[in-house]
């Protein structure tokens, strides 16, 4: 596997499309819209697919199809393990699972999703050696934890990033990060959430021993219960984000938009 240091996860996806010359791809409805925008921009035909309530894909795909599958909230490594044995052209979006093993023909993560002092950057693992004429990102910044407004501003900046190699600032911050410490901290916080919320969580999932989730995903019994929990968390200084854009209520996945509370490890 080649490791490529790029400036964002979405540009990792762009790199993959270019590297393999992908013209058609399967993408789930339940996913950040930036990924479909990348595919559209690169001229890919997109076939959208549904997922079940355990996050596994509903359909059976053509054997040699290119498939983008997200490791949702970092709790879906067992599903990834099954898919990679069936589909030779699986692409794994590990934006929510930095510590996951490389899988499929390519997989990528997102530094800023896991390390609050890092603003951008992503690692791409790809089984094809290619050479693109791209520049190194020159973005520089002072590392600090961002408030909500600054996070939104940074998101808008990332939306407009050209595909470039990771900036020196981001690379240095990443290399100076104690990955073992961050891993242990996340697992500890996740376990604390488990003790409090597992009995009432409508999501049924079992982690692999090495899984390090992005957050604690809590599926409330009703939309009203979810709203109450979000309000309570906000009153305690915890910002909760919706994942992702609203989708039609007739879709299975709409339950996640309406009732899933992604509790951050802050």
Language model regions located:
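Hydrophobic transmembrane helix bundles of membrane-integrated enzymes that assemble
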Residues: 10, 60-61, 77, 81, ...
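Conserved active-site segment immediately N-terminal to the catalytic lysine
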Residues: 89-125
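PLP-dependent aminotransferase class I/II
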Residues: 31, 50-51, 68, 134-266
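Active-site PLP-lysine loop of aminotransferase-like
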Residues: 73, 108-120, 128-141, 266
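Short, polar loop motifs at secondary-structure junctions
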Residues: 30-34, 74-75, 93-101, 129, ...
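Generic structural signal for small/hydrophobic residues in well-ordered secondary structure
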Residues: 12, 25, 71, 93, ...
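PLP-dependent aminotransferase-like
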Residues: 2-3, 11-85, 89
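Short loop/helix-cap segments at secondary-structure boundaries that form the rim of catalytic
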Residues: 36-41, 58-63, 79-86, 98-105, ...
């Amino acid at each position: 596997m080649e490791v490529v240091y790029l400036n964002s996860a979405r540009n990792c996806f762009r790199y993959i499309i270019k590297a393999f010359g992908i013209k058609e791809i399967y993408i789930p409805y339940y996913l950040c819209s930036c990924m479909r925008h990348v595919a559209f921009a690169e001229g890919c035909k997109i076939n959208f697919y549904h997922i079940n309530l355990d996050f596994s894909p509903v359909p059976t795909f053509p054997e040699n199809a290119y498939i983008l599958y997200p490791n949702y909230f970092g709790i879906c490594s067992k599903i990834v393990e099954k898919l990679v044995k069936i589909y030779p052209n699986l692409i794994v979006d590990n934006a929510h699972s930095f510590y996951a093993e490389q899988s499929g023909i390519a997989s990528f993560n997102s530094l800023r999703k896991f390390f609050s002092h890092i603003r951008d950057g992503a690692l791409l693992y790809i089984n094809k050696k290619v050479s693109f004429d791209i520049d190194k990102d020159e973005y520089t910044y002072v590392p600090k934890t961002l408030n909500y407004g600054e996070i939104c501003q940074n998101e808008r900046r990332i939306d407009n990033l050209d595909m470039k190699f990771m900036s020196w600032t981001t690379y240095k911050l990443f290399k100076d990060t104690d990955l073992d410490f961050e891993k242990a901290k996340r697992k500890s916080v996740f376990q604390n959430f488990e003790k409090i919320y597992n009995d009432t969580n409508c999501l049924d999932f079992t982690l692999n021993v090495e899984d390090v989730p992005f957050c604690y995903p809590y599926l409330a019994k009703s939309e009203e219960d979810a709203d109450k929990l979000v309000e309570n968390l906000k009153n305690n200084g915890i910002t909760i984000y919706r994942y992702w854009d609203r989708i039609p209520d007739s879709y299975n996945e709409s339950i996640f938009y309406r009732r899933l509370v992604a509790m951050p490890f802050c």
